[in-house]
Amino acid sequence: MPDELKPHFANVQAHYDLSDDFFRLFLDPTQTYSCAYFERDDMTLQEAQIAKIDLALGKLGLQPGMTLLDVGCGWGATMMRAVEKYDVNVVGLTLSKNQANHVQQLVANSENLRSKRVLLAGWEQFDEPVDRIVSIGAFEHFGHERYDAFFSLAHRLLPADGVMLLHTITGLHPKEIHERGLPMSFTFARFLKFIVTEIFPGGRLPSIPMVQECASANGFTVTRVQSLQPHYAKTLDLWSAALQANKGQAIALQSEEVYERYMKYLTGCAEMFRIGYIDVNQFTCQK
């Protein structure tokens, strides 16, 4: 990879290394920090998060003994589920020190004999052949200018029959917002600025066509795009309710300012999904 492509460590750590204990106040026990999949209405958040992981992994055609690369592995739930359910070897990449330490503990406590590695590194620093790639909730941090480099690397790492499952929030182009009759308000614009400056520094959302075009330009065929839009609104509602229920602990761990900022982020994003300004999609990319 070109020397100038350095991973965005500072931007990612500014959010994800806030405090594991703080995130545990509103995430489910698997600590999965992405859209859940409520296959049934009566599912708990934990059940729905595992269902989402299974939905993603089920699109990869995993076979025992394969090696799966998890780009942006979070606190390790997808990696460990893949090992347990599909009997594969896993490599996880994260830019968060806290997440890397947590996954190291999961790996150390696992009795499964498959190879399990977590690297405090970005995809820009990875160059080992793998059989399948999954990336859930990381693409939003890459930046538009790196999409081609990412898809090019993924294509190079995968075998001839390789598959990548990319799960990412997607945004509408202003033209699409206008065409759908959605209001373009200063409130919406201000909220977006708040998200990319105070919650996810450097974050940029792709559009669906942007992902499809970059994938195709780098040798992939996008065989399926699945939207989970209503599922993210529900996930965010459950997160904000849990954080609100733990307000005292949240303030003790951080501050009232951080608590209010996160409540604004969680409730505001839920509304953005409900209105339709943003979506979340799983892209199945076949080599």
From Swiss-Prot:
Claim: Transcription regulation is one of the keywords in the record: no
Active-site feature positions: C269
GO CC entries: cytoplasm; plasma membrane
InterPro entries per UniProt: CFA/CMAS, CMAS, CMAS_actinobact, SAM-dependent_MTases_sf
Function: Catalyzes the conversion of a double bond to a cyclopropane ring at the distal position of an alpha mycolic acid via the transfer of a methylene group from S-adenosyl-L-methionine. Cyclopropanated mycolic acids are key factors participating in cell envelope permeability, host immunomodulation and persistence.
Principal place of residence: cytoplasm
Native species: Mycobacterium tuberculosis (strain ATCC 25618 / H37Rv)
Entries under SUPFAM superfamilies matching the protein: S-adenosyl-L-methionine-dependent methyltransferases
Subcellular location, record wording: Cytoplasm
Domain of life: Bacteria
Assembly description: Homodimer.
UniProt KW keywords: Cytoplasm, Lipid biosynthesis, Lipid metabolism, Methyltransferase, S-adenosyl-L-methionine, Transferase
Disulfide bridges in this chain: none
Family: Belongs to the CFA/CMAS family.
Protein name according to UniProt: Cyclopropane mycolic acid synthase 1
